[in-house]
Amino acid sequence: MAGTVIVPWYATGFRADAFELALNEVAPVALRYGADSYAVYRANDDRYRFQQFASFAEHLDWERYWEGPEMVDFRVRHSSWYQVPVLYGWWEQTAAGALVSGLPPLANGHGNGHGVTAGESA
């Protein structure tokens, strides 16, 4: 079953900037283990707080990434750079949306409906 893993990290004192660099280096490795996408976010209101996201088609692929040599090495090398325990969760997406820029407008801009091809006005 597809899902997204969210890993909440909290860096220890004065290590947040270095932790960010290290986490940004290891996060893309998830793609080699079958992830469709990954992301790392850093909180603006608490610069020690990070969220790591990785979307997988199968939970087993996540486990292979988390227990793989790259992530084990990351956790060992940087064990004093973040607080434990690290309690990640497997999440199922229930809704999503996005605005896509660069697409031509559906209407001609004259208000007469030409070019409208879908929706209630069609």
Each model region followed by its residue ranges:
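Short, well-ordered beta-strand segments in beta-rich or mixed alpha/beta enzyme
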Residues: G3-Y10, A39-P69
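Long, low-complexity, intrinsically disordered polar/charged segments
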Residues: M1-D17, F56-W62, H78-V84, Y88
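Short amphipathic alpha-helical segments
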Residues: R15-Y38, E70-F74
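Glycine-rich beta-strand-turn "strand-cap" elements at beta-sheet edges
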Residues: A2, D36-Y48, F74-A122
